[in-house]
Every structure is written in C-alpha cells, then in structure tokens.
C-alpha cells in the first residue's frame, strides 16, 4: 500500500496510552495502532480522525502540521443523570436498584458492567426476579442449545428477552444480539466495554452498574462515553443515565489525547520506535534503539515486523532459541505438523511471549498442558469438533449449571484470545527468529509455520473463509459449505459463492439464511 487518498480513524483516543496510578502502562494495541498511523501518514493525502469528549490533542503536530483540530461539546440528545452513590462492592444493593429502575421505567435498557462474569450474574439475578419478555426467537434459542448448551447463561438470557454482549462471544452471536436489541426483540442488553467499541444501539436508558473495566477504574472520559449511549437522534431525544456508583471526578487529562509517535522521550517503547516510519523517528529515539541493538544481538527487521511485542520479550525468546543445539533447531524446522519434541519447545517459547495471556485466560502454564492443548486443537477435524469435545467434557463433569456456564465462557475466551490471536502471533515470531538463526549458522534449514498458524488463526477453515466469521456468518455454517478453490483465495469470490448458496441451497434453515442475510446485506 503505497498511496491512499484518505484514511479515517474512528475513536482515535485509542492511540493514546492510558494512565494507571499516574504511570504509563504498556498496551500492545496502542503500539499497533501507532505503527499503523505512522505508515498511513506517509502514504495518505488526507486523514480524518473522530472521537468523543476530546478537548485537546498533543503530539500530532510534531509529525504532521497540516491538520485542523475541532473540539465540540454538541450533543444530539439531552440526558437526565441519576446518581445513586452505591459502594462498588455492594452487589446486592446494585442488583436490587437495577431491578427497581427496570420495573419503574418503560423502554429499553443498556447495562454497563466490568466483566462477562458480572454480566452473567446480573442476567441470572434478573431472570430469577421474574424479568422476562418473549423474543419470538425459538429457532435461535434451539440453535444456541444445540451448539453451546442449554446451561449457558447467554442461552437462558435470550429465552427471557435479555441480551449479553462481550468481546469473547463469537462475532455472529455478538452481532445478532445487537440486531435483536435494535429490533426491540430484546429489551435489556448487558454489556462490558464492548458498548463503547463500535456498537450502535438505540437505548432510552443506560445503567452504569460498575465504574470499572475489568479490575481497572474507568476515568471521566470513559464514563462520559458510556453515558453517550443513552438516547438516539430521531428515536429518543432524551436519554436517561443511571449511575449506580459515585461518578468519577473529571481531570483535564481525561479529555486530552496524546499521540505517542509525536511525543517521543526516554520512556517511548523501543519496539514502537522500531515499528515507526523512519521519518517519524526522532534523533533521541534513533540513538536509544541503536544503542540497544548494538548491546544485544537482535535484528532490527524482526523487531520492526513484530513491533507489538515488548522488545525484552523478543530478546528473551531470541536467546532461548539461540541457546538450542543445531539438532534442536532442526526439530523446529518442520513444514506442517510438529512432533512432540518440537511442540514442547514451541510451548516453552509461548510462555516467554504469552504467559500473561495464558494466565489471564485461565490456561495452565505447565508445558505438558499447553502442548496437549495445542495438539488437541491441531488434530481436531474441525473447529466445531474440538469445541464439541470440550463442551461434552464440561457438561459431563458433574458440576453445577453456573459452573458449566462459566467453563463454556472460559473455552470461548481461550478460542478468541489464545488460539486465534496470541498463538499464531507468537508462532510467526518464533518462525522468523528460527530462520534468522539458521541463516546465521549457515544451516540449510527452514521453518515454515504457516500451516499451523492458519489452523489457529482461521479456525481450521481454508484461505479467506474465516473473514466471513468476522462479518457475522457463524463457523457452524461455514464448515458445512464446500467452497471451490478460487473462492478460498479470493474474498470477493468467496462472498459471491456464499450468496449463491443462500439463493440456491434449500437445505439452509431459516436462521442460517438470516445469519447470511445480515452479514452480507442480502
């Protein structure tokens, strides 16, 4: 991509590092976004960046002076704010207050909470309290029971007219839930931070149940962003926001967006510097990076290609692989399937790059467990056969229904965060380091991990088919369709083929056709 007419970044505040206890913290998404911004600024004739509640912008003028910044406090709807000042850990009072708000008001409700676990807890409480409405979506409920279980809280919630929305849900389920809400088939939508990440809804009432995102407090900026989900121009001209906890205090810093690539100093991550375009790298940053590279043996091209990784993790992985004997390097230079010895080393390498991800997603950090988990997924016939085996194990383990639901969510987290993201990302880095070392040692060997990377990244689907999952076609449908070779390599032909299946295949159920309709706008 060498020439672009215009690029647009929505929610551009995500370019800025967040502050926790007044210190910057590392966020690989911020790194990746800034690397992309640096590239786009060098190839695009124009740019347009949009975001809410932003009063000041810092850093952009240091790398591009040709722009106009406009700050506006214009609102398309009026908001009524109700404060309840409930203590954060008083769950029983927050639950009863939420129920009271729902019972006393008509219309639709979005409930923001800190985590999927809390979302399920709220849903279960509302169901037990008799909150229910008919969605007329029996076919969807049966589909959920077939592929995910009747014990899953999401399934139970849908049957009672309550929707759940959080990041680890399959894309098709996320998008279908929003459709049900916007079409008023579901009147209550319980969300995590996905509510402010591109989800378009039209609720009259917003209940801010928690002032946290995970374990971290949300600032005034994020709080205002959530409030902004109440009301909708031409539908609800007045929105109602119910803040259960005391609202966070506003600071001037909350409305400032800092662009890291334009504010380089001694704290700028070295991997961000390596990933930036040369014309955006300051002399200070250039000296820091060169000093680091000369003191260590890391090749700059690998750091640049894998800029989202902290540079010390890349160095640790490089040293781990470089310590291996030639025969051990040879074991890692497979083309399709690894043997047990290679998989154990890959698992060890994964702990260097992704230990926090494993821990955060409740994955054991025992080498044998990781190796067995990877083999189980790689050797499964399809993504669904793997998930079905996990589901069967969970349901037959003689535990309570809430525990079953919690373990189903854990499996979905592992699939979304570990299998389809962290593992293929780490494998690509491992492959490049191995091949660099082979070249350095003059070994006539090559590691090619593309086969297993695709298995994880694309849910066992060939070529570009997995892109349709991101668009909202469930994997369960995609696995049924035999795509021709040209459709596998060309996304436009892939979309054209599935449209033909939609029009000509009489075996698709009404629900399956509906999924395809909404994803491909048929």
Please provide the spans of the model-predicted regions.
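Conserved segment of the helicase C-terminal RecA-like domain
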Residues: 41-47, 53-54, 205, 212-259
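C-terminal helicase lobe
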Residues: 68-72, 89-90, 229-324, 328, ...
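C-terminal accessory/interaction regions of large nucleic acid-associated machines
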Residues: 281-522
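Interdomain hinge/linker at the junction between the two RecA-like core domains of SF2 helicases
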Residues: 6, 55-102, 145
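A short beta-strand element within the Helicase C-terminal
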Residues: 4-8, 188-212, 224, 239-244
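Conserved C-terminal RecA-like helicase domain
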Residues: 1, 86-98, 102-188, 203, ...
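SF2 helicase catalytic motif II
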Residues: 2-42
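Residues immediately C-terminal
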Residues: 14-21, 56, 197, 232
